[in-house]
Amino acid sequence: MNTEATHDQNEALTTGARLRNAREQLGLSQQAVAERLCLKVSTVRDIEEDKAPADLASTFLRGYIRSYARLVHIPEEELLPGLEKQAPLRAAKVAPMQSFSLGKRRKKRDGWLMTFTWLVLFVVIGLSGAWWWQDHKAQQEEITTMADQSSAELSSNSEQGQSVPLNTSTTTDPATTSTPPASVDTTATNTQTPVVTAPAPAVDPQQNAVVSPSQANVDTAATPAPTAATTPDGAAPLPTDQAGVTTPVADPNALVMNFTADCWLEVTDATGKKLFSGMQRKDGNLNLTGQAPYKLKIGAPAAVQIQYQGKPVDLSRFIRTNQVARLTLNAEQSPAQ
């Protein structure tokens, strides 16, 4: 009877109460149980008061109760019904897995952005290349046009400078036709006197007149020589005037150009006169004079060295950009584009 009553009384007790009674029978304190089980005193107190800590999972709580029961020598089978009530197994809340659609969407958006960036980059590179090619082609066409224009001007100048056919018909000197026969004695007397030859006049290269020997004889015979006839034999020859030779003075506005490679250029002075227009070969040089300021067009600035008023002209800005040089040289040597 006493055994059955004790069994019924144990069943009436909760799990926490049975663990507390067993601890007190063994003379253990909550602090001693907490130290042996490596638990907090508050956790041991919650177990004895049948409280389930909110921050403690049911699996851990059941494990702590079993360890406590073994410590106070209570069979685990007797505590199982109470464990189901005090610490029921709760289904773990599984957090829903985050879909990868967001990552895929972001990756797709990044892919479109990268594609658009590359497309813009290719368009910029293509436009830059097209602009450079058009500029280069325009410069080449301009140089070709200027060269053709120069060739046309040179050909027209050569056609205008062709020699005109000369009239070589012999003209009769009226002095020789009207000379009476008595002039023969005069010419005979002249043959005995020393003949003073006058210096031959300079021949103009622009004149293409040709004098025949017969005309030269007629002119010599027609020239009166009374002075030679009256000059005694021992007299000194008549003094002749000698043309004074003058050294040309260097023009302060002279434009000197030396060429290190083939180059096309055109030079115009202030009056609009073209001092030069055409091609200059390598190692050539030009020395031009005119009325300042000069206007220059140079197809290859790197191939020419210019000196104006004895000072070099800076063409570096045209050489760096590799373009046709257009500049004006004024009296103060300040080239302006």
UniProtKB/Swiss-Prot annotation:
The keyword DNA-binding applies. One of its GO terms (biological process) is regulation of cell shape. Residues 30-49 bind DNA. GO terms for molecular function: DNA binding. The chain crosses the membrane at residues 112-132. Its main location: membrane. Pfam families: HTH_25, RodZ_C. Residues 145-236 are annotated as: Disordered. It is a single-pass type II membrane protein. GO terms for cellular component: plasma membrane. Residues 168-207, 219-236 have a biased composition (Low complexity). SUPFAM superfamilies: lambda repressor-like DNA-binding domains. InterPro entries: Bact_Cytoskel_RodZ, Cro/C1-type_HTH, Lambda_DNA-bd_dom_sf, RodZ, RodZ-like_C. Residues 133-337 are periplasmic. It comes from the Bacteria. HAMAP family: RodZ (MF_02017). Belongs to the RodZ family. This is Cytoskeleton protein RodZ. It comes from Escherichia coli O157:H7. The gene is rodZ.
